[in-house]
Every structure is written in C-alpha cells, then in structure tokens.
Amino acid sequence: MADWSAEQYLKFEDERTRPARDLLAQVWLDDPRRVVDIGCGPGNSTELLVKRWPQAKVTGVDNSADMLRQARERLPGHNFIEANIAHWVAPVGTEVVFANAVFQWVPNHLKHMQRLLGALAPGGVLAVQMPDNLDELSHILMREVAFQEPWREQLSTAAELRDTLPKPGVYYDALRPLCSRLEIWHTVYNHALDSAAAIVEWVRGTGLRPFVDPLELPERKAYLAAYTARIAAAYPPQADGKVLLRFPRIFIVASK
C-alpha cells in the first residue's frame, strides 16, 4: 500500500481517539518510567500517554513517514521511531506497550503480542485495542464492490491484508499463561456522522486503503462512486439526518 495519510486519518480525530482514551483508562500503572506507543500514527494516542504520565519517557513507533512527521510536529521534543512492529524489539525496562488500532494490520499478531508481553519489565502492561469490523457493512461492501468488474482482477488480494480477528477466548488462552492479570472486553461504538459520504471519508483513512490505493485515478473515482452508493443504501439517516457508523472493537489489557 501507499504511505498512510495523517491528514485523512485525522479528519475524524475525536472519534478515532475515543477508544484510545477508553483503553488508557483501564491501564492500572500509576508511575511507569518507560512507555512505548506502537502504531502511534499522528501522535493523538501518544499525546494521551504524555499527559497521563508526564514523568515517563514516552516513545512513539510507526512505519509511516507521514504519520511520524505529524506526530513530531504535534509533540516536539519527544522520541519517535520509524519501524515495522513485526520486527521491533521493546527496549529493556519498558513498562507499558500501548497498541491502539495497530495489531489488526500485523500478520500473526497474536505471536507478536506474546513476544512483547514477555519482553516487558515485571509488572509491566501490554494494552491493546483493535477494530473488529470486517463483518460490518462498511467492510462487506468494500469487498462486494471489489469483486465486481472492472476491479475484480486488480483488487483480488485487497481483502487479504487484514484477517478476521480471533474470538476473545483465543486471546485469553494465548496470553493468560504469560501474565498475572488479564482483562478482555468487546464493545460496539455507534459514531454519529453527518452523512453516508462521511462514512466513506472515515474508511478512506484506514480500511478502504487496500482497495483504492492500487487503482489509478479514473478507476479509483469509479470504485468510490459505486461504494458510496452502496453505503448510502446500507446506512439510512436517523431522524436528525445523521447516520450511525457501527464500529465493534476488542480491548486487551495484560499485566506481566
């Protein structure tokens, strides 16, 4: 895929940051000294960590140059590293690894969660939030349009960049032997957006990228028009004209 766009991602900054706030509220450490925000994106989640633990050394890690550029502008003086999370190694003494909306993009992510949990300092916390929305209409319709002509051949592998998440019990069995405390919950957000077009703008920053990035501009416009029409039919307006984007997410907080 092309590099992520911080500008596109931040069009819905408040809504995207809310799950990070909810995840952070359940991290029970009061005074960690070394905190890492993996998949830090444009720094919106990193900023929460800096405010929660001003005394800590907070480092952001991401594989997108554009996201890191925005993060450095947002939090000058803080350390940001460009790295692939699948190969990144937590520094010795890391007490918190915060991973908001990133592991769903990492192949075999459960293995890497186990690896990072094992690398934490004693009593350290791995805090994870992942979208669990591949079975939502917003994503089903991406695939349906992609399977049609003229996009079928070019987008034949687009859906393979993300796998359906395992059930909570799978995470529990894999992580419980490695930790002293484990909390897992699954919730559904209903984001009130201005229109069906706003839903399309939201997913263009994340889930729609594998479907539109490979296309040239004319094909991309045609794909987006077909997708937008289906979204408009699938998400009727509420009484006030807003549309509700249903968005399931899974949360995991594990203490070593």
Curated annotation (Swiss-Prot):
MF terms in GO: trans-aconitate 2-methyltransferase activity
UniProt KW keywords: Cytoplasm, Methyltransferase, S-adenosyl-L-methionine, Transferase
Catalyzed reactions per annotation: trans-aconitate + S-adenosyl-L-methionine = (E)-3-(methoxycarbonyl)pent-2-enedioate + S-adenosyl-L-homocysteine
E.C. number(s) listed in UniProt: 2.1.1.144
Example GO biological process: methylation
GO cellular component, one term: cytoplasm
Subcellular location: Cytoplasm
Top-level class of the enzyme under EC nomenclature: transferase
A Pfam family it matches: Methyltransf_25
Family: Belongs to the methyltransferase superfamily. Tam family.
Function as written in the Swiss-Prot or TrEMBL entry: Catalyzes the S-adenosylmethionine monomethyl esterification of trans-aconitate.
Name assigned to this protein: Trans-aconitate 2-methyltransferase
Source organism of this protein record: Rhodopseudomonas palustris (strain BisA53)
